[in-house]
């Protein structure tokens, strides 16, 4: 394992009138990793190293998909590696220990039933019932501030693609689309009745128009008193900053609150590959700098309109997190949340939570075999973000070095 190196970050804050807390960086590792043994830290380091290799990642993902197709017993391997790192458990009951441990550090939990790509009415109904259970769980537990769902858990991908393309639906498809809208309405109505905000995840650009339609319809109905329904905006798309501003204008004109989760995006390679294959301009910004610029501009826009917007900054980017933290006049602003994925960005989550900011971890769960598509996507996304994964490795190295130094100092004191 390479020698650990010190990392620091210093960025100018967003403009603000006054500040009660000024964060300089996210270099502190002790609190972020204190619940991990030295052995576990080394296991995590090797996992991130494998994920940081595009070749190994590609081969591993292909092998895992092949094993699933052949119905090979891969669950034990997945459970001991990717699942252990990025999931809270297989059931709600198994997630309780994770929820409690995070709550001890003032970090909330967003339970994410991470089953993707359902294709049957029975499967869609099961996902709907699970999301409703998560809303009930959140109502009963203050450590769970949001519920969340993916529309592809409630509807066929092909149907969402056709609706998004504004194609004429057959009578059967029209009935199917009505069913999808009814499922979303059941979830969002339950969320409003329970006073539990619910986030709708963003997905591929060619089905996103249908998701946006469902989200905005639900906001008009349920966000009259406060933001209950949150749509997710992926700022790696060229058009999303303008879309955010258009949504705000609509909310302002129609008298409802806009709820948004701001993310950079999770389907970059897939989006670019499809655009190249079908011969249309990629909807994704050509550079990371362009994405960062739009992401930070989106945060700045939301901060300027907190009387009408509630938002969650879903980011592992230290610069964006520092800027937002240092821009807030009070850490625990009721309309602002930070969020990172479970198993990643702990140095950001724990530092923010220790200073009183609203922080929540996205905690995926579900049966191991059913969440493998999510885990593969997470591994592939991390491989595309090699700089970030390298940062996770270096933080683990820094914590191991810190422990070794502390152990040596303690030993020397004992000898003296």
What residues fall within each predicted segment?
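Positively charged, amphipathic and often flexible ligand-engagement surfaces
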Residues: 2-416
């Amino acid at each position: 394992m390479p020698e650990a190196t010190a990392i620091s970050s210093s960025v100018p804050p967003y403009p603000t009138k006054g500040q009660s807390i000024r964060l300089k960086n996210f270099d502190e590792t002790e609190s972020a990793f204190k619940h991990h043994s030295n052995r576990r830290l080394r296991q995590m380091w090797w996992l991130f190293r494998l994920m940081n290799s595009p070749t190994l990642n590609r081969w591993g993902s292909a092998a895992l998909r092949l094993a699933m197709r052949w119905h090979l017993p891969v669950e034990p391997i997945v459970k001991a590696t990717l699942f252990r790192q990025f999931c809270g458990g297989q059931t709600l009951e198994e997630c309780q220990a994770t929820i409690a441990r995070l709550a001890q550090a003032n970090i909330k939990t967003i339970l994410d039933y991470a089953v993707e790509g359902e294709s049957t009415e029975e499967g869609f109904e099961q996902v709907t019932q699970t999301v409703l259970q998560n809303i009930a769980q959140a109502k009963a537990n203050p450590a769970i501030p949001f519920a969340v769902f993916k529309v592809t858990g409630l509807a066929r991908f092909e149907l969402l693609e056709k609706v998004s393309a504004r194609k004429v639906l057959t009578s059967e498809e029209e009935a199917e689309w009505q069913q999808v809208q009814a499922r979303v309405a059941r979830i969002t109505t339950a969320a409003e009745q329970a006073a539990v905000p619910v986030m709708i995840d963003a997905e591929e650009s060619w089905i996103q128009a249908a998701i946006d339609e469902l989200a905005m319809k639900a906001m008009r109905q349920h966000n009259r008193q406060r933001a209950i329904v949150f749509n997710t905006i992926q700022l790696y798309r060229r058009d999303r900053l303008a879309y955010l501003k258009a949504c705000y204008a609509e909310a302002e004109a129609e008298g409802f609150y806009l709820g948004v989760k701001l993310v950079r995006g999770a389907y970059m390679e897939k989006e670019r590959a499809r655009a190249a294959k079908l011969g249309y301009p990629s909807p994704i910004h050509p550079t990371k700098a362009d994405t960062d610029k739009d992401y930070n501009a989106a945060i700045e826009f939301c901060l300027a309109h907190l009387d009408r917007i509630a938002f969650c900054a879903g980011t592992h980017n230290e610069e964006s997190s520092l800027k937002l933290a240092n821009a807030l006049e009070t850490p625990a602003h009721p309309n602002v949340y930070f969020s990172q994925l479970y198993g990643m960005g702990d140095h950001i989550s724990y530092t923010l939570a220790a200073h009183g900011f609203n922080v929540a971890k996205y905690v995926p769960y579900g049966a191991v075999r059913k969440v493998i598509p999510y885990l593969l996507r997470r591994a592939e996304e991390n491989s595309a973000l090699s700089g970030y994964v390298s940062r996770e490795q270096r933080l683990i190295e820094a914590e191991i070095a810190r422990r070794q130094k502390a152990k040596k100092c303690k030993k020397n004191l004992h000898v003296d």
